[in-house]
Swiss-Prot record:
Phylogenetic placement of the source organism: Viruses, Riboviria, Pararnavirae, Artverviricota, Revtraviricetes
Purpose of the protein: Determines virus infectivity.
Signal peptide: none
Family statement: Belongs to the lentiviruses Vif protein family.
Keyword annotations of the record: Host cytoplasm, Virion
Annotated region described as Disordered, given as residue ranges: 1-22
Subcellular location: Host cytoplasm; Virion
Basic residues bias: start-end ranges: 10-22
Keyword Transcription recorded: no
Taxonomy, superkingdom: Viruses
UniProt-recorded name of the protein: Virion infectivity factor
A single GO cellular-component term on record: host cell cytoplasm
Keyword check for Lipoprotein: no
Amino acid sequence: MERTIQSPMGRRRGSSGRRKRNANIISPPAYAIYPAPQYRYPRWEFVMNDLYSQTARLQKEEIIITYRYAVWAREWKIQTGFLDLGYLMTPAGTHTTGELNELDLFWVRYTLCQHRSPKWRELLLGEMTHTSCRRTAQAAVVSHTKPHTLQRLAGLTLVCNQNLCWYPVGTVTRNSPLWMHFTTGKEPTIQQLSGHP
């Protein structure tokens, strides 16, 4: 049997189009809205922004950055010509959702040199004997990318910005995640990444 609606107004779907009698100037915070609004698709902008983590992995000369919110995950692919994730890293304080497509999200990792490129984990674990320099990274970029491509341009830009690098501090073990919050050893939240306490 068809459901009868117990209201004289018919079935009203959304409230966005209609005039509200005394619409408040200041809107209540989300937790005060009752019952909780049901959306038909996830609204990226409004997801609680402390439920957030970011990881990157490499696949066939592409860096794949995964931003993971509470329930949904979203991926960005950034084409780089070279295959070693060891040359790239994400600094603290650069990423908001809007800045994601910018290349200066990434910096090259090493600053000093004996002209050989170390592995990043080695460096963090304190097992490093040499430290690397821009020249090495530049050589790596040039040897792994085709000339006159955006990849090479991007790679060389990263190498130029190399002194802007940032290291996560703290105990790093062989299988710890690439980005770590420096006091707790967990992956950082968006506030920590953006420099808020």
